[in-house]
Amino acid sequence: MKKILIIGGGAMGSAFTFPCIDNKNEVTITEPYNKTFIKNLSSKKKYHSSLKINLPNKLKYKKYSTHLLNNKYDLVVVAL
């Protein structure tokens, strides 16, 4: 299992979470600009308003900060 960080919760970054989680990876997503996105992810449904779908339940989210990059990830995807 790889640890993957996705920076950017838009359509591309969010869509990328599905195959990553399907392949048994630990995925964390963060959004540096859109606070509404993070609010929606904190709900139980993890609803993405642009894609009009619920994101995977195993998806983790964290509030963006530069300290987040100090954690060890196998892959960092920038989808901005």
Question: Can you describe what each PLM-predicted range is?
Answer:
Residues 75-78:
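N-terminal Rossmann-like NAD(P) cofactor-binding module of classical short-chain dehydrogenase/reductase
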